[in-house]
């Protein structure tokens, strides 16, 4: 992740002139998440795609990562370190939580039958 953050930083400074403001990038991130949500709703929900509409979630996921990395760079967040801390936090907090959740284990039991 750290290398990708550096690549985003280099691209912005080389081709983008400078970073957009944090608020603008936050709005851009929200927009990209909305675009992914539209694809997911059409693919897995009840709506169908319109003619010519983007159906590729990977493109939108990559756009989300791009803007998230730009925001991280602007705010001094090392996403490699932050993700590791998040994994550790979730592991400590949820070590048995999901294994003991009947809502999750019921499906597994039904599939095993």
Label every PLM stretch briefly.
Residues 1-61, 65-113:
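Flexible "arm" and connector segments at domain edges
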């Amino acid at each position: 992740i750290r290398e990708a953050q550096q690549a985003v930083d280099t691209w912005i400074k080389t081709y983008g002139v400078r970073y957009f403001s944090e608020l603008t990038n936050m709005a851009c991130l929200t927009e990209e998440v909305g675009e992914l949500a539209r694809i997911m709703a059409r693919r897995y929900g009840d709506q169908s795609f319109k003619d010519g509409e983007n159906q590729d979630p990977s493109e939108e996921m990559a756009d989300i990562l791009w803007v998230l990395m730009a925001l991280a760079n602007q705010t001094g967040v090392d996403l490699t370190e932050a993700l590791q801390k998040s994994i550790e936090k979730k592991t400590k907090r949820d070590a048995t939580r999901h294994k003991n959740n009947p809502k999750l284990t019921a499906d597994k039991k039904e599939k095993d039958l």
